[in-house]
C-alpha cells in the first residue's frame, strides 16, 4: 500500500471571490445542474425509518448506519436487507457503514475481524458500497492506518468474489478529518492506490461551518483529480447545498439534511 505519486500541492482556489454572489442566487430544489453536472444527493440515514421519504425527496444514494449520535456504526442485518430492497426498487443505491463502535478510528484485531465479518454480510445483502475508515496514533496526532485499510479492502474484494459480484464502491469516511491538512493531501495517494472510490470529508474540524472549509476542500478536490471523488459532508443542507456545489464544482453532496424532509 502507498505507492508514491510525486504529489504536487495545488494552488489556492479563488472561488471565494464570487461565493457571496452565488449565495444570493442559490436555488432550493431537489435536483440541480451546475456547469453541466447533474447533482447526486447522498442521504445519511440512521436505520430504515427515513429512507423512503429521503428517496422520495430526491436522494439517489443512501449512506446507511446506526447510532448517529456517535458518528454512525454498522446497522443490523435486517435493516441492511430492508434498505437495499427498498432502495433498489426505487432506483437508489446503498452505501453501508462498517464501524463496530463509536469513539476513535483505531481498531484492534478483534474489532478488525468484526468489521470483516460485517462487511461480508453487507455485501451478501446486496449493498452497492461500503463506508469505513481507520487511523492510528502518530506523534500526538493521527495517521492513516494502512495495514487495517489494506485488510478491509482485501476483505471487501474477497466478499464480492464469493458473491460473484462486480467490485463495489468504497468510501473512506470522516476518519479522514482526523488527519492534519497536509497529511490529508498525502493520504489521497494511498487511498487512490488502494482503490478507494471516494472520501467523505467536512474539510475541517467537526462543528465548523462548511463555508469556512471550502478553500481546503477545493485543494483536496484538485489533488484527487480523477483518481477518486471528494464527497463534501457535514453542515450541508437544503439551505446551502446549491451554493456549496457551485463553489466547489462537485456533483455529489452528503448529509442528514441534504434533501427536504418533514421534521
Where are these regions (language model features)?
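Glycine/small-residue-rich loop that forms an oxyanion/phosphate-binding "nest" at active or ligand-binding sites
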Residues: 92-145
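C-terminal alpha-helical cap/extension of soluble enzyme domains
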Residues: 99-103, 206-210, 214-263
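Catalytic cores of alpha/beta
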Residues: 49-51, 106-118, 179-193, 236-250
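Hydrophobic faces of well-ordered beta-strands that scaffold small-molecule active sites
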Residues: 41-43, 62-64, 94-98, 130-132, ...
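Hydrophobic, well-structured mid-protein blocks that either form specific transmembrane helices
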Residues: 127-179
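Active-site-adjacent beta->alpha loops and helix N-cap segments on the catalytic face
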Residues: 49, 69-86, 137-155, 179-185, ...
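Glycine-rich phosphate-binding active-site loops on the catalytic face of alpha/beta enzymes
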Residues: 63-72, 125, 131-138, 196-209, ...
Amino acid at each position: 500500500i502507498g505507492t508514491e505519486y510525486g504529489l504536487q500541492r495545488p494552488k489556492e482556489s479563488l472561488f471565494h471571490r464570487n461565493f457571496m454572489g452565488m449565495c444570493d442566487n442559490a436555488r432550493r430544489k431537489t435536483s440541480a445542474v451546475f456547469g453541466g453536472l447533474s447533482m447526486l444527493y447522498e442521504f445519511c440515514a440512521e436505520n430504515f425509518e427515513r429512507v423512503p421519504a429521503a428517496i422520495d425527496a430526491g436522494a439517489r444514494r443512501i449512506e446507511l448506519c446506526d447510532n448517529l449520535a456517535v458518528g454512525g456504526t454498522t446497522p443490523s442485518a435486517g435493516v441492511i436487507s430492508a434498505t437495499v430492497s427498498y432502495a433498489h426498487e426505487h432506483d437508489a443505491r446503498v452505501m453501508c457503514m462498517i464501524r463496530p463502535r463509536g469513539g476513535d478510528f483505531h481498531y484492534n484485531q478483534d474489532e478488525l475481524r468484526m468489521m470483516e465479518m460485517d462487511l461480508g454480510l453487507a455485501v451478501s445483502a446486496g449493498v452497492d458500497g461500503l463506508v469505513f475508515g481507520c487511523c492510528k496514533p502518530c506523534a500526538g496526532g493521527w495517521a492513516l492506518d494502512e495495514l487495517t485499510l489494506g485488510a478491509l479492502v482485501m476483505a471487501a474484494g474477497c466478499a464480492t468474489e464469493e458473491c460473484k459480484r462486480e467490485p463495489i464502491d468504497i468510501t473512506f469516511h470522516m476518519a479522514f478529518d482526523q488527519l492534519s491538512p497536509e497529511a490529508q493531501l498525502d493520504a489521497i495517494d494511498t487511498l487512490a492506490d488502494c482503490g478507494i472510490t471516494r472520501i467523505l470529508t467536512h474539510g475541517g474540524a467537526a462543528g465548523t461551518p462548511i463555508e469556512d472549509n471550502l478553500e481546503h476542500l477545493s485543494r483536496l478536490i484538485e489533488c484527487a483529480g480523477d483518481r477518486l471523488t471528494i464527497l463534501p459532508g457535514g453542515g450541508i443542507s437544503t439551505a446551502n447545498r446549491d451554493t456549496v456545489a457551485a463553489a466547489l464544482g462537485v456533483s455529489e453532496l452528503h448529509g442528514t439534511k441534504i434533501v427536504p424532509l418533514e421534521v
